[in-house]
């Protein structure tokens, strides 16, 4: 009886977490002032949002019913919140998942950010298996890519258990020994990922080492 009750509680918790996940995504995809830059050079402006399937729904005016655009024909989008425009690009993780990522730095190594507010991934309490649960703090994932590569890799995360930053960063930036040395000496920690990428793009003696800052956070 206790085991059945325990299983029921786990299922209830998982269902509640998934429901919360859905509403969190919905809340994070409200319509905003949006500008779409297509691969062919076309630019459209209006109000838009990122849909659950990653397409962009854009309304050109109040009378427009809106059109869904395939993310694969879009170079980037700009979403304006509280008068501040942020650039997002559609990328593919090494594990195959696709998502829109906020652009922080573009250069020889580009840095991207993905916020997951209100929920977390980890071990569900009392269940013995991993899944999604509530979180009191937001989780932020940071991704890196070589230049404009479509595929990105997680370099670190904040607010959640992440990869060994020292090992991951040392491997990714192995062509810059001075940076690896700073990471291993803990001069740069995972909280400093912005400075790490900026250092690599501007200080390391590698080809095309330039850095364009798109956002500080």
Q: Where do the model's predicted regions map?
A:
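C-terminal partner/receptor-binding element of secreted or periplasmic proteins
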Residues: 174-217
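Sec-dependent signal peptide cleavage junction
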Residues: 28-45, 51, 193-194, 205-217
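Alpha-helix boundary/interfacial micro-motifs
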Residues: 22-23, 28, 57-58, 208-209
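A general boundary/transition motif marking the beginning of the first structured unit of a protein
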Residues: 2-4, 157, 184-188
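Aromatic-patch recognition
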Residues: 37-39, 44-179
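Bacterial Sec-dependent N-terminal signal peptides
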Residues: 1-32
């Amino acid at each position: 009886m206790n085991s059945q009750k325990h299983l029921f509680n786990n299922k209830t918790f998982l269902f509640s977490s998934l429901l919360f996940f859905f509403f969190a995504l919905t809340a994070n995809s409200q319509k905003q002032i949006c500008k779409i830059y297509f691969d062919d050079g076309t630019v459209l402006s209006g109000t838009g949002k990122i849909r659950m399937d990653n397409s962009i729904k854009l309304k050109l005016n109040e009378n427009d019913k809106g059109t869904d655009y395939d993310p694969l024909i879009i170079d980037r989008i700009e979403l304006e919140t509280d008068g501040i425009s942020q650039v997002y690009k559609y990328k593919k993780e090494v594990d195959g998942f696709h998502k829109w990522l906020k652009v922080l730095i573009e250069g020889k190594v580009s840095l991207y950010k993905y916020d997951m507010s209100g929920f977390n991934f980890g071990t569900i309490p009392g269940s013995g298996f991993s899944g999604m649960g509530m979180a009191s703090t937001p989780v932020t994932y940071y991704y890196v890519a070589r230049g404009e590569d479509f595929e990105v890799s997680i370099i670190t995360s904040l607010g959640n258990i992440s990869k060994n930053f020292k090992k991951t960063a040392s491997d990714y930036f192995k062509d810059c020994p001075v940076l690896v040395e700073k990471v291993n000496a803990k001069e740069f920690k995972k909280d400093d990922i912005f400075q790490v990428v900026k250092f690599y793009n501007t200080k390391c003696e590698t080809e095309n080492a330039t850095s364009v800052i798109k956002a500080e956070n």
